[in-house]
Amino acid sequence: TNERHKHCELGFGQGVSLNIHAASSFGLFFGTDFNPAHAAHANVLAEQNQVPHHFYDASFEELLNKDLPMFDSISLHGIWSWISHENQHIILQFIRKFLSPNGIVYISYNCLTGWAANMPVRELFHSHFKFNSTSTNPLQKVNDSLNFSEELLTQNPLFAQRNPNALNKVQDLKKQNPNYLIHEYLNQDWQCFSFQQVVRILEEIKLTYAGSTDLNSHLDN
């Protein structure tokens, strides 16, 4: 068919991967990122590559109310676990409204199975960052919170005795870029989901699980 497939990415960040796809395929790409600087960067890349594009700095609710085509695919990477229940509901409405029959949704999220052991560490880190650090500098607050968490766990409380990797996790976090940690761990909204939870949520809007996009998981060796 000569008809162009249409794709939409919710929360495209700097828009790099979105532009790569737009430049290397016959599809027509739409997307939004609430950060105006991110959206501006994505649009500059698209204009430099001379690819048709529709990139916005709209909220999910604003995008829901736009006059948009039906999409063959809708993607959200690094979004679902870091937004409010209200925004999750809006995204479900968006998918139900704009996904073509037989369309595909790609969704990534923090999986409970992998995160369960580190959730108390994140809660300790986040609580000190939000309530106890005396600094007004976010990067210093990250360092203060990690130092506090490390000092607490080195006292070998019962939690650390039962979860010996907790201290190692904090020490690993201290090696990370503080800006990354703010985004990854310190959002106001932060949730983990089991696989079955996500399946049930998406079944409510008539989606059926198709498979993992990690190609390695489909190989025997």
Predicted regions and their residues:
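Conserved SAM-binding motif I beta-strand of class I
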Residues: 28-33
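Conserved SAM-binding loop
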Residues: 42-43
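Conserved SAM-binding strand-loop segment of SAM-dependent methyltransferases
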Residues: 50-60
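Conserved SAM-binding loop of SAM-dependent methyltransferases across substrates and taxa
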Residues: 14-26
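Rossmann-like AdoMet/SAM-dependent catalytic core
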Residues: 157-221
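A short acidic, Gly/Pro-enriched loop at the edge of an enzyme's catalytic core
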Residues: 65-74
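A short glycine-rich, Lys/Arg-flanked "PGG" loop and its adjoining helix->strand segment in the class I
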Residues: 89-101
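Conserved class I S-adenosyl-L-methionine
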Residues: 107-136, 141-158
